[in-house]
């Protein structure tokens, strides 16, 4: 008895020799790639690799020849679906669903929802028809089980191969979606980093301008300190000269009196007259000297008074100037303290900004490094999955050749 295999359309490499297409979708999880289908409820494992069972891939057998000539034509009649409906199924299948991307809009989502609703309706109809066909196929297989003892092992091998192919397709779609998500995250971090660059440059320029202001304030402070030192030296010189002038004036006013010894008087008239004349001349000279001294002292007193008045005026002016200078010094000291406080605040702000920028750069570098490592890992996994997929496709083509040869042998046996 000849047996033919009825399998669902695979996501890639569909063979036209498989007459019946059968899909089963239980749920839609998140975003699917155009070639991915949801897996059935029961979890199944494969003997080859560690892949998950391919969703929507089922293997059945349909008799060819024999009763009613079951085959492609009989299957189509059993399905009760016109060629137009099947063509619509092929044109509106998952292969035509556009691949989602990070920039899909609301219209694309609505179109995808409509396509998925239409597809689900057709899938439910196909499931009902497939259940009827499966019942017929199982009844026919049970009647032919004795003559086809080796068919179970072959069917298990085919199921395993199709399962591995479907699992590889699903894993590839999942990895592609994960790569797109990671790439979108990396682009977002890169955009944030580029947006932060102008703020960082503006902060650096502001800090540079503040450094210039601080340097100018330091220069002004140094100049004012030099001026204060020169004013202090001039004030000390004026104080010393004033003290010296006062001491000289005191020395001039404090004159010393000369002590003169008495001359003994003679006993004669001439001696008496001579003594009187000498005393009179001495008194005259003394009075003249006293008058000259008094006049000179008066003149010196007037000069000293005038000089004292000028010195007092100069001292008052110097005291006023000293008061103004001290007030300027105090204001400059207060301004210097405020500039120092401003400098400390700016230095703290600069330190905080630099620390924050360093932390941001470190975080971004760590994120970029992690994303690059994940991207490299995903690329390696993708390459491995592609290699496994190519290997499975080769196995599939080999199995299809074996199935074709088995079909030929079964046809010859049936004809014989």
Curated annotation (Swiss-Prot):
Where does tissue-level expression of this protein occur?
A: Detected in retina lens fiber cells (at protein level). Also expressed in the lens epithelium, abundantly expressed in the anterior and anterolateral epithelium, less frequently expressed nearer the lens coronal equator (at protein level).
Q: Where is this region: Head?
A: 2-115
Q: Does the keyword Acetylation apply?
A: yes
Region called Disordered, residue ranges: 1-48
GO MF terms on file? structural constituent of eye lens
UniProt feature, compositional bias: Polar residues: 28-48
Chief location category: membrane
Where in this chain does the record put each IF rod domain? 105-416
* The entry's keywords: Acetylation, Cell membrane, Coiled coil, Cytoplasm, Cytoskeleton, Eye lens protein, Intermediate filament, Membrane, Phosphoprotein, Repeat, Sensory transduction, Vision
- Residue list for modification Phosphoserine: 27, 33, 36, 91
What ranges does the record give for the region Tail, renumbered to this chain?
397-416
Question: For the modification N-acetylserine, which residues carry it?
Answer: 2
Q: Does the keyword Transferase apply?
A: no
**Which Gene Ontology terms of cellular component type are present?**
cell cortex; cytoplasm; intermediate filament; plasma membrane
Q: Where in the cell is it found?
A: Cell membrane; Cytoplasm; Cytoplasm, Cytoskeleton; Cytoplasm, Cell cortex
- Which family, according to UniProt? Belongs to the intermediate filament family.
In Swiss-Prot or TrEMBL terms, this protein is called: Phakinin
Organism (species): Mus musculus (Mouse)
Q: Print the organism lineage.
A: Eukaryota, Metazoa, Chordata, Craniata, Vertebrata
